[in-house]
Amino acid sequence: MSVELWQQCVELLRDELPAQQFNTWIRPLQVEAEGDELRVYAPNRFVLDWVNEKYLGRVLELLDEHGNGMAPVLSLLIGSKRSSAPRAAPNAPLAAAASQALQAAAANAAPAAAPAPAPAPTSAPAKKAAAQKAAEVSEEPSRDSFDPMAGASSQQAPVRAEQRTVQVEGALKHTSYLNRTFTFENFVEGKSNQLARAAAWQVADNPKHGYNPLFLYGGVGLGKTHLMHAVGNHLLKKNPNAKVVYLHSERFVADMVKALQLNAINEFKRFYRSVDALLIDDIQFFARKERSQEEFFHTFNALLEGGQQVILTSDRYPKEIEGLEERLKSRFGWGLTVAVEPPELETRVAILMKKADQAKVELPHDAAFFIAQRIRSNVRELEGALKRVIAHSHFMGRDITIELIRESLKDLLALQDKLVSVDNIQRTVAEYYKIKISDLLSKRRSRSVARPRQVAMALSKELTNHSLPEIGDVFGGRDHTTVLHACRKINELKESDADIREDYKNLLRTLTT
């Protein structure tokens, strides 16, 4: 009976919690029953402490509500339910098995394939090996190859972008840089980049018949460049003789200026209009460059008319690029425009585990979770944080622990805590919606105030470690059920209301960048 009651409570928690939190902390729980006792297993003290603070109270409430007066006695253990000698943790909470959460995250990140079976309970060493293997499915994108620590004998030298020179007759020498380390195989896929990855693969595997142009947009360090290089590398793998040209938009401008200086503009046009695939990064740098926009406009038209593939990236939606001609914005919308969002928690953990594995460094799962929960903005910041931790570990001759991470990232963590405080969230939301902070704390229920208040509560729940009662208290003394309702409402609206979805995304980016 205890196991059935537990499963019932888990289903209720699935409805109450955001999918990310449920999948990370609740879904992988290991339980077993013996008589009236329900044993719940967690992998380590870090996870126990986290769940104790965030979820234990609600779990006990549900067990009591649905146990018909016969709620089971909970025994909380550290280990696995098949472990021969689990370690008791008196007064410890229910917890998620972090290693299995990693397996679930990596499974979600893998390219579409046959559904993987649910992980069976295993011994702790086997779980660790399986989680590490799962984390190796892919690698999160970055502009530069990973070089965690210069001078460390245990690490490989960084792999630089390969220079691929395409020579044509005339005065100009055209160079395309494709980074061979950026492939689809080592790209970590998650909810934040799933559509972008699928679209890029469609273009790479079926050029000229997929989406043309493909326009990827999003903040820095989220994987746009990785996907662009992955397409180019796949095209060359299929056809080594293909003329695939990757360049930054400023390089296109520089080439055009040089062509004008050398009186070789016809050669410039002939080269760029004869490629099989043109990949241009950071197209927003064309803004207010009228001659460059004019030339690119005609090049773009010629390529699409000839059935050649065009892929573009930008840090913002094309129609939001100020100083870009409307005719270009219109043409960029002819194909598919896809946003690349900041990675969610599971993906961030998988990134860190993969990068640590590449660097041949042992990164405990609780350490990966600790970093991932605090560095939310983009992959480059994650990599930078991990590099500092690895360097600190190497120079101090110490293993990577939570304590060492706190020491090595002290300034960064202090800044993050300052940026994502509830006070700062309230101030940022009030400024965004052009209302007063006092409105957020008031009893006013008009939609112009109530909706921003709900957004601020949802952001506080996602970005801080405060409990629901604590959040309610700083929003005018509201109770935890009001905060829970606000979070559920905003999650629903993000699925159905494009304006709320865009507002939430903009605020999240502001608070975590």
UniProtKB/Swiss-Prot annotation:
<dbReference type="GO" id="GO:0016887">
    <property type="term" value="F:ATP hydrolysis activity"/>
</dbReference>
<keyword id="KW-0067">ATP-binding</keyword>
<feature type="binding site">
    <location>
        <position position="223"/>
    </location>
    <ligand>
        <name>ATP</name>
    </ligand>
</feature>
<dbReference type="InterPro" id="IPR020591">
    <property type="entry name" value="Chromosome_initiator_DnaA-like"/>
</dbReference>
<feature type="region of interest" description="Domain IV, binds dsDNA">
    <location>
        <begin position="394"/>
        <end position="513"/>
    </location>
</feature>
<feature type="region of interest" description="Disordered">
    <location>
        <begin position="113"/>
        <end position="163"/>
    </location>
</feature>
<dbReference type="GO" id="GO:0005886">
    <property type="term" value="C:plasma membrane"/>
</dbReference>
<feature type="region of interest" description="Domain III, AAA+ region">
    <location>
        <begin position="177"/>
        <end position="393"/>
    </location>
</feature>
<feature type="region of interest" description="Domain II">
    <location>
        <begin position="87"/>
        <end position="176"/>
    </location>
</feature>
<dbReference type="GO" id="GO:0005737">
    <property type="term" value="C:cytoplasm"/>
</dbReference>
<dbReference type="InterPro" id="IPR027417">
    <property type="entry name" value="P-loop_NTPase"/>
</dbReference>
<comment type="similarity">
    <text>Belongs to the DnaA family.</text>
</comment>
<dbReference type="Pfam" id="PF08299">
    <property type="entry name" value="Bac_DnaA_C"/>
</dbReference>
<feature type="binding site">
    <location>
        <position position="224"/>
    </location>
    <ligand>
        <name>ATP</name>
    </ligand>
</feature>
<feature type="binding site">
    <location>
        <position position="225"/>
    </location>
    <ligand>
        <name>ATP</name>
    </ligand>
</feature>
<dbReference type="InterPro" id="IPR013317">
    <property type="entry name" value="DnaA_dom"/>
</dbReference>
<dbReference type="InterPro" id="IPR003593">
    <property type="entry name" value="AAA+_ATPase"/>
</dbReference>
<dbReference type="Pfam" id="PF11638">
    <property type="entry name" value="DnaA_N"/>
</dbReference>
<keyword id="KW-0446">Lipid-binding</keyword>
<dbReference type="GO" id="GO:0005524">
    <property type="term" value="F:ATP binding"/>
</dbReference>
<dbReference type="InterPro" id="IPR038454">
    <property type="entry name" value="DnaA_N_sf"/>
</dbReference>
<dbReference type="Pfam" id="PF00308">
    <property type="entry name" value="Bac_DnaA"/>
</dbReference>
<dbReference type="GO" id="GO:0006270">
    <property type="term" value="P:DNA replication initiation"/>
</dbReference>
<dbReference type="InterPro" id="IPR024633">
    <property type="entry name" value="DnaA_N_dom"/>
</dbReference>
<feature type="compositionally biased region" description="Low complexity">
    <location>
        <begin position="123"/>
        <end position="135"/>
    </location>
</feature>
<keyword id="KW-0547">Nucleotide-binding</keyword>
<dbReference type="InterPro" id="IPR010921">
    <property type="entry name" value="Trp_repressor/repl_initiator"/>
</dbReference>
<protein>
    <recommendedName>
        <fullName>Chromosomal replication initiator protein DnaA</fullName>
    </recommendedName>
</protein>
<feature type="binding site">
    <location>
        <position position="221"/>
    </location>
    <ligand>
        <name>ATP</name>
    </ligand>
</feature>
<keyword id="KW-0235">DNA replication</keyword>
<keyword id="KW-0963">Cytoplasm</keyword>
<dbReference type="InterPro" id="IPR018312">
    <property type="entry name" value="Chromosome_initiator_DnaA_CS"/>
</dbReference>
<dbReference type="InterPro" id="IPR001957">
    <property type="entry name" value="Chromosome_initiator_DnaA"/>
</dbReference>
<comment type="function">
    <text>Plays an essential role in the initiation and regulation of chromosomal replication. ATP-DnaA binds to the origin of replication (oriC) to initiate formation of the DNA replication initiation complex once per cell cycle. Binds the DnaA box (a 9 base pair repeat at the origin) and separates the double-stranded (ds)DNA. Forms a right-handed helical filament on oriC DNA; dsDNA binds to the exterior of the filament while single-stranded (ss)DNA is stabiized in the filament's interior.</text>
</comment>
<feature type="region of interest" description="Domain I, interacts with DnaA modulators">
    <location>
        <begin position="1"/>
        <end position="87"/>
    </location>
</feature>
<keyword id="KW-0238">DNA-binding</keyword>
<dbReference type="InterPro" id="IPR013159">
    <property type="entry name" value="DnaA_C"/>
</dbReference>
<dbReference type="GO" id="GO:0003688">
    <property type="term" value="F:DNA replication origin binding"/>
</dbReference>
<dbReference type="GO" id="GO:0006275">
    <property type="term" value="P:regulation of DNA replication"/>
</dbReference>
<dbReference type="GO" id="GO:0008289">
    <property type="term" value="F:lipid binding"/>
</dbReference>
<comment type="subunit">
    <text>Oligomerizes as a right-handed, spiral filament on DNA at oriC.</text>
</comment>
